[in-house]
Amino acid sequence: MPLLKLVFLGTGGAVPRSDRTLPAIYLEDWLGHRFLLDAGEGAQYRLLQIGVSPASLTAVAITHQHEDHTLGLPGLVITSRFLGGRTAVLAPRSMHKALEALGVEVMDSYGGDRLRVSCVEVCHTVDACGWLFQWDVGYKLDLSKAAGLPRWALTSLIRGSPVEVGGRLIKPEDVAEPGHKRLRRLLYTGDTAPCPEMWRKVGEVDVLIHEATFADDVEPQKAHEEGHSTVADAVEAAKALNAGVLILTHVSSRYPDKRRHRELAASVKPPPHVYVPEDFDTVLVRL
């Protein structure tokens, strides 16, 4: 079953609170990939608190150079090295030279088992990547069309490979359920103002993790000039991207709690499903 596990290790931004630390999200998929999305100060300790070794990460995906998203990286890299690992880091190209000095493997995209991760340019005050995850979940077969096919053939068809049975070539599309969507997508924006050009380039996503630095007490124009978004901006992005799940994070320390963010998110009509997690909350998403 295509299932994502997201653990929100740090849901604040810029300045931490005692109960809201700096940006870091642990993502684990059903294929065994393990990613850390941004590495705010103390990220490795928070990973250890949920039982994840820094050396076990597939990669760390950094959105941009600001310190609240990067100060946890050096310690994590050193710990991983002591444990026999070598950290791979996805980052904007403007950061590559500095990261290479840390002795890490620097990449601007990732291609693994049925997963691709790529940078999409967002609208921040510095060079910044949103990270687009795209999984190939295979085909869901129409059992009436696939009746009588041997098990080995079904396995190959689900994985997207054509088969020859009894002298007949069968393509996955021939026996798939109509309208089945083979690719599933998650976008993590990092810091961004509303970014219609990015929305158009990306198209659609299933899950959107979007910053919501401000609720509704800051003039939108001021938020945008600082390269950030309000709750309403994040909702607009989710609608533009046709996201089924919207998760709001990077909440400013000016808010003692997230009550107003939740009230605003709850007023969204029509949904997507909207979550405003606290530090260490886990969200499971079935793709």
UniProtKB/Swiss-Prot annotation:
Co-factor remark: Binds 2 Zn(2+) ions.
Residues forming the catalytic site: D68 (proton acceptor)
Protein name: Ribonuclease Z
Organism, scientific name: Pyrobaculum neutrophilum (strain DSM 2338 / JCM 9278 / NBRC 100436 / V24Sta)
Lineage: Archaea, Thermoproteota, Thermoprotei, Thermoproteales, Thermoproteaceae
Enzyme class: hydrolase
Catalytic activity: Endonucleolytic cleavage of RNA, removing extra 3' nucleotides from tRNA precursor, generating 3' termini of tRNAs. A 3'-hydroxy group is left at the tRNA terminus and a 5'-phosphoryl group is left at the trailer molecule
InterPro entries: Metallo-B-lactamas (IPR001279), RibonucZ/Hydroxyglut_hydro (IPR036866), RNase_Z/BN (IPR013471)
Transmembrane residue ranges: none
UniProt subunit comment: Homodimer.
Chain residues that bind Zn(2+) 2: D68, H69, D191, H250
Gene Ontology MF terms: 3'-tRNA processing endoribonuclease activity; zinc ion binding
Cofactor dependency: Zn(2+)
